[in-house]
Amino acid sequence: IQLARNGFYGAAPNPMVGAVIVHDGKIIGEGYHVRCGGPHAEVNAVRSVRNPELLKESTIYVSLEPCSHYGKTPPCADLIVEKGIPRVVVGCMDPFAKVAGRGIRKLQEAGIEVTVGVLEAECLALNRRFITFHTHHRPYITLKWAESADGFMDSLRTDYEKEKPYAFSTPYTRMLVHRCRAEHQAILVGRQTALADNPSLNLRMWPGKSPLRLVIDRRGDLPGHLALFNDGAE
């Protein structure tokens, strides 16, 4: 799971996956899915093994079910069968329609011992965005707001142009907000927030790519000078 997290920024929209190969109680290979379109975790783990002959007496641990279909890369289940790895331990099933248990069946039909559901909750949580999309057919949504101890989200203002919004966030929590932006593909606010706070909604305090900015506005007449329309806005 820790290995898989290394692919957070590069693997999307694919899931994060980590793989570890163990022989006689010792790790002899490891890998993770670095970027979409590149080799999967199982491939990188196999390639990292110095003595391929040991694979025939090893166990491969993988956080997500090995794929069984041809996409941008060949099936990882086929690679495991080809290398003669006798045991596979899987964290959780892959809900993607082209996999969804087929990888497990392919391994079992080849005579490989397969164990599924080890640290399953942690593996599902790791790819909660991917899992939500393929099981509920909707985006994974995170709600974010800042409020005072007595439940207020802003001071009373009558002129948004002259009166700036009251900042409840600390430097540390602002950094966490930008980390959250880096971990999501889009950020959504309403018309009133766009006018009252004039937010940039871009990424500044954390490495990564700024999310797609979305505004719900029934009127469709937001002024063009708002910061969210300017990529360089600070």
Predicted regions and their residues:
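Short, basic/aromatic recognition patches
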Residues: 1-12, 133
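Short beta-strand scaffold segments in enzyme catalytic cores
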Residues: 17-25, 144-146
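A polyampholytic, Gly/Pro-enriched intrinsically disordered region
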Residues: 109-116, 133-143
